[in-house]
Amino acid sequence: MSEYSLFTSESVSEGHPDKIADQISDAVLDAIIAQDKHARVAVETLVKTGVAIVAGEVTTSAWVDLEQIVRDVICDIGYTSSDVGFDGATCGVMNIIGKQSPDINQGVDRAKPEDQGAGDQGLMFGYASNETDVLMPAPITFSHQLVQRQAEARKSGLLPWLRPDAKSQVTCRYEGGKVVGIDAVVLSTQHNPEVSYNDLREGVMELIVKHVLPAELLSKDTQFHINPTGQFIIGGPVGDCGLTGRKIIVDSYGGMARHGGGAFSGKDPSKVDRSAAYAGRYVAKNIVAAGLAERCEIQVSYAIGVAQPTSISLNTFGTGKISDDKIIKLVREVFDLRPYAITTMLDLLHPMYQETAAYGHFGRAPQTKTVGEDTFSTFTWEKTDRADALRSAAGL
């Protein structure tokens, strides 16, 4: 649901340089948290031609083979040859990780876990709307689906000339706040030198675009821009330097909601940039699922070393069944938004994060996953298990 008549969002594939960096950072986090659930982790990655640099601050009892983790991520994405532009088996890997500052640590750790302070100050937003079945904005949902399908077609051999790097962009048309059509589609995908442009365009249109986008939203007036420069052979870290945390709008709501500015990947749950943004999505989604509003955006803010949020604000954009002030009161009753309580509520101390680092952190289906002897649910912030409590408390 949008106030705009047209709204555009973009996504990028797992082979985009910034997403390579995000996935490496979260793979390192997962490897550490699998051994030490109470580790403090803040890992940043830079990838460029022939090299991956991993830096940050980590305090943990775990030992992980960082170089092998980096190589595995790069190879699993599909960068396995210099012909593609990057080779995980032969690239350089530089490790410049240090320990977390004791000044930060003393503000976070407490004798009573529930009194754990926020790892930093900041503001975070959560959002949900009823315009798609996953309660996400349509433009970002469709954009993610396009690049997910690109990776699927590449890895399965359906379109064997595809390479890992790709970007998508979808413009949706709204009337009365509802999606009534798709105005424009952009899909740029890396490819090998042998495929002709006509074959590429036909393959992408038939097996990616039309496979993903609802036919009823496409028309003779929809604009399709498939590799509009005509050629996209050089991609990945050769084409562009990749950095962790540089796709925060792709990671969240595609610009439909506000963003506090903090990135997610490479950060353990004590960092409210990540955990409170997940909690914000959980709260907003349950509000919409409960029928309290058709659209909801929530803001929470924190001070470093302080457990209680410094503020909780909410906007239902005139779609609420009860007042926003009453919904905020219900949020305070039903959800505990202190950092440790968020970690417990969403069961965040598991190696669940690499999967979030491509194709969006929100609008994803929770799945049961086992790593070693640890069985847990992924994407727990997408559950709507508090909708009934909200509905009941609201008297609806």
UniProtKB/Swiss-Prot annotation:
Q: State the free-text cofactor note.
A: Binds 2 divalent ions per subunit. Binds 1 potassium ion per subunit.
For binding Mg(2+), which residues are annotated in this chain's numbering?
Answer: D18
Question: What organism is the protein native to?
Answer: Pseudomonas fluorescens (strain Pf0-1)
Q: Which SUPFAM superfamilies is this protein grouped with?
A: S-adenosylmethionine synthetase (SSF55973)
- Quote the record's binding site residues for K(+): E44
User: Which cofactors is this protein said to need?
Assistant: Mg(2+); K(+)
Reaction(s) catalysed (UniProt annotation): L-methionine + ATP + H2O = S-adenosyl-L-methionine + phosphate + diphosphate
Disulphide-bridged cysteine pairs: none
Q: Please tell me whether the keyword Transferase is annotated for this protein.
A: yes
Q: A biological process (GO) annotation for this entry?
A: one-carbon metabolic process
Q: Under which main EC class is this enzyme filed?
A: transferase
What role is this protein assigned?
Answer: Catalyzes the formation of S-adenosylmethionine (AdoMet) from methionine and ATP. The overall synthetic reaction is composed of two sequential steps, AdoMet formation and the subsequent tripolyphosphate hydrolysis which occurs prior to release of AdoMet from the enzyme.
On assembly, the entry states: Homotetramer; dimer of dimers.
Q: Does the keyword Metal-binding apply?
A: yes
Q: In which pathway does it act?
A: Amino-acid biosynthesis; S-adenosyl-L-methionine biosynthesis; S-adenosyl-L-methionine from L-methionine: step 1/1
Which UniProt keywords are given for this protein, alphabetically ordered?
ATP-binding, Cytoplasm, Magnesium, Metal-binding, Nucleotide-binding, One-carbon metabolism, Potassium, Transferase
Summarize where L-methionine binds, as residue positions. E57, Q100, D240, K271
Specify the protein name: S-adenosylmethionine synthase
EC number(s) from the headed UniProt entry: 2.5.1.6
Looking up InterPro entries in the UniProt record yields: ADOMET_SYNTHASE_CS (IPR022631), S-AdoMet_synt_C (IPR022630), S-AdoMet_synt_central (IPR022629), S-AdoMet_synt_N (IPR022628), S-AdoMet_synthetase (IPR002133), S-AdoMet_synthetase_sfam (IPR022636)
